[in-house]
């Protein structure tokens, strides 16, 4: 330990005594699993960790997928039966995945955080394409609102140049039309029905991965922020249906209906945390690339009161330099 920054103990199921010793002296346990096998806890795994529950040793599950796998699946089944602090998906023989695993295990992970910003969110696509072209890599992804939508492409490991094509095909030119076109003619809950947004998200995800994809099935660890109006606080979503969670994070109050989750109402995450750099830092990222789309400017209006609709409309017809 005096001569090296890190020591790795390689255990062998045929030597249970050594396994116990290795775990007892470890600062972190890394479980490596063949993702094509049963998710059930093996006998050696149960024996290995059962005697050290009170040590609270951080545990990482590394799931190895066959080369060429389009998307992980059924990750939730693995996570539900064992206590791990994080999981990492890698493809056999994939140099980029191995480099990502190395950064995560050595505490050098790079996080990408995409802020909300309405229509400005399309800017994220250009930025991610530029990062990809420049060879800039990242290991964790997090986003709010529009950043949650665009961040899902990065989390699914969609190539930078393909993101724009898939986004336009799903959210603008898709078979259901524009996501802002499903007006609610009786806007009791919201201006838009919200159905198109969900279908468009499902279409984008199915094109790049699989239908009904869980957030835990993303190649890169991913979180989105929603605003829980039932508990009056932000809510971090890392598990559950990816399309549903993305819509929950981007449902602007009054414009789209809330997402009902476990009996609670979730709206656009921008109400509580529009630029969740703090959550990315808590996730363990050593370096963070943050993209904030909203200008940090204070704007004051020299008006005695809010104008009426007619006054505001007339003001729009004035020359730009004379508008109030």
Model feature map: region roles:
Residues 10:
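Cationic-aromatic interfacial patches
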Residues 1-6, 14-144, 152-324:
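Patatin-like phospholipase
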């Amino acid at each position: 330990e005096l001569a090296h920054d890190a020591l790795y103990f390689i255990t062998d199921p045929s030597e249970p005594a050594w396994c116990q010793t290795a775990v007892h002296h470890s600062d972190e346990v890394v479980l490596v699993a063949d993702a094509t096998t049963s998710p059930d806890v093996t006998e050696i795994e149960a024996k290995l960790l059962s005697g050290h529950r009170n040590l609270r040793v951080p545990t990482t599950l590394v799931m190895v997928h066959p080369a060429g796998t389009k998307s992980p699946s059924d990750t939730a089944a693995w996570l539900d039966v064992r206590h791990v602090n994080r999981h990492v998906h890698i493809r056999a023989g994939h140099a980029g995945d191995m480099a990502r695993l190395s950064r995560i295990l050595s505490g050098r992970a790079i996080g990408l955080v995409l802020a909300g910003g309405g229509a400005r969110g399309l800017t994220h696509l250009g930025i991610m394409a530029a990062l990809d072209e420049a060879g800039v890599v990242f290991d964790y992804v997090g986003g709010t609102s529009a950043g949650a939508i665009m961040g899902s492409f990065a989390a699914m490991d969609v190539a930078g140049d393909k993101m724009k094509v898939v986004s336009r095909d799903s959210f603008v030119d898709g078979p259901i039309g524009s996501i802002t076109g499903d007006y609610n003619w009786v806007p009791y809950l919201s201006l838009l029905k919200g159905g198109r947004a969900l279908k468009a998200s499902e279409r984008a995800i199915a094109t790049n991965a699989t239908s009904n994809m869980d957030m835990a099935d993303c190649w890169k660890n991913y979180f989105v922020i929603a605003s829980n109006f039932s508990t009056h606080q932000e809510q971090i979503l890392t598990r559950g249906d990816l399309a549903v969670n993305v819509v929950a994070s981007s449902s602007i109050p009054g414009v789209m209906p809330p997402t009902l989750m476990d009996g609670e109402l979730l709206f656009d995450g921008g109400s509580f945390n529009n630029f969740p750099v703090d959550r990315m830092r808590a996730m363990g990222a050593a370096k963070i690339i943050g993209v904030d789309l909203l200008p940090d400017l204070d704007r004051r209006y020299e008006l005695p009161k809010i104008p009426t609709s007619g006054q505001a409309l007339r003001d729009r017809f004035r020359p730009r330099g004379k508008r109030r």
